[in-house]
């Protein structure tokens, strides 16, 4: 799994320059140098919108930044998963992180880039999608640049026995 199993049992700690709580809507908004911690999870950004149910359980989070950033430590791993994008959505019930616009996810030397990266934290599955292919211009053919997903997967290193 992406997160340590104990992360969900930890309190959520949030720091920001400004906070606004709307109990009727079940939403809290934080602005300005926002930082979030929960167990091994650390997120930073400019704006955080957090939605809660009637029992004050977290449902989802949307972090906006230039870029917004997150880091998590997976179970049975010493290598953190890090991600950045203009928008990072965390869906607690689905155990899913969705990164949108200039999204990058890294784990050690592995790297995925795309317009949209969907990370299933429970099953450790990454799905990346590019922007629609760019139209042809004077200096680039149609489909060049933005319309691609990029992955870097290092070779497996043989360890001496």
Which residues does each predicted region cover?
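Mature-chain termini and adjacent capping regions
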Residues: 1-161
């Amino acid at each position: 799994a992406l997160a340590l199993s104990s992360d969900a049992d930890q309190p959520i700690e949030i720091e920001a320059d400004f906070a606004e709580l709307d109990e009727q809507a079940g939403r809290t908004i934080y602005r300005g140098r926002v930082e979030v911690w929960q167990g091994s999870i650390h997120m930073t950004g400019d704006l955080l919108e957090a939605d809660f149910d009637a029992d004050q359980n977290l449902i989802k989070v949307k972090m906006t930044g230039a870029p917004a950033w997150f880091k998590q430590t997976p179970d049975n791993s010493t290598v953190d998963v890090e991600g950045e994008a203009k928008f990072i959505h965390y869906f607690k019930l689905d155990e899913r992180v969705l990164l949108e616009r200039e999204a990058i996810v890294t784990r050690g030397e592995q790297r995925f880039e795309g317009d949209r990266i969907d990370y299933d934290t429970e099953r450790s599955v990454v799905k990346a999608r590019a922007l629609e292919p760019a139209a042809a211009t004077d200096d680039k053919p149609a489909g060049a640049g933005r319309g691609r997903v990029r992955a870097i997967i290092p070779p497996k290193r043989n360890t001496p026995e």
